[in-house]
C-alpha cells in the first residue's frame, strides 16, 4: 500500500484511537513522525511513545493519555498537505485557540511548537494543529 501522506495517516490513527479510547496504537515510523510524537509527549497530549526496530522502517507505538472523564486531545488537524503546502514567516506563526492548543511546525531548526518557533524567531511549514 502506497501512502500519499504518512503524517496525515498518523494523525488520523491517533484521532481514531483517541475517539474509541484505545490505550495505545502503532503506526509505521519515520524521523518526522518520531519528532511529532516527541512534541506531543513533551506538551502533555500523549503519555509516551516508543520506537520498535524491525527489519524495515520500524514501528512507532504511541500510548494515549486520558483525563478522568475526558480526552486530552480534543482536536487534531493536518494543515499543510502535499497538494497545498502552508508556510508562515516568523512574525506570522499562529496561536491555536489563544494558546490553549499548539501548532506543530517544520522549520530549518527541526520540528518545533508554535511557542518555540516564536522564541527562536523562525518560520516554517505548519504541519498540524493540536487542541
Swiss-Prot record:
One of its GO terms (biological process) is translation. It comes from the Bacteria. GO terms for molecular function: rRNA binding; structural constituent of ribosome. Keywords: Ribonucleoprotein, Ribosomal protein, RNA-binding, rRNA-binding. It holds the Pfam family Ribosomal_S8. InterPro entries: Ribosomal_uS8, Ribosomal_uS8_CS, Ribosomal_uS8_sf. The keyword Phosphoprotein does not apply. GO terms for cellular component: ribonucleoprotein complex; ribosome. The keyword Ribonucleoprotein applies. Part of the 30S ribosomal subunit. Contacts proteins S5 and S12. One of the primary rRNA binding proteins, it binds directly to 16S rRNA central domain where it helps coordinate assembly of the platform of the 30S subunit. HAMAP family: Ribosomal_uS8_B. Belongs to the universal ribosomal protein uS8 family. This is Small ribosomal subunit protein uS8. It comes from Geobacillus stearothermophilus. The lineage of its organism: Bacteria, Bacillati, Bacillota, Bacilli, Bacillales. The gene is rpsH.
Amino acid at each position: 500500500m502506497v501512502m500519499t501522506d504518512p503524517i496525515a495517516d498518523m494523525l488520523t490513527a491517533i484521532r481514531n484511537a483517541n475517539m474509541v479510547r484505545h490505550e495505545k496504537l502503532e503506526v509505521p515510523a519515520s524521523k518526522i513522525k518520531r519528532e511529532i510524537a516527541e512534541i506531543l509527549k513533551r506538551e502533555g497530549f500523549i503519555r509516551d511513545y516508543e520506537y520498535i526496530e524491525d527489519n524495515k522502517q520500524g514501528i512507532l507505538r504511541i500510548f494515549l493519555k486520558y483525563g478522568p472523564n475526558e480526552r486530552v486531545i480534543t482536536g487534531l488537524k493536518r494543515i499543510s498537505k502535499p497538494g497545498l503546502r502552508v508556510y508562515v514567516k516568523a512574525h506570522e506563526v499562529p496561536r491555536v485557540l489563544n494558546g490553549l492548543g499548539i501548532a506543530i511546525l517544520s522549520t530549518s531548526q527541526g520540528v518545533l511548537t508554535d511557542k518555540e518557533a516564536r522564541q527562536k524567531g523562525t518560520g516554517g511549514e505548519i504541519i498540524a494543529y493540536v487542541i
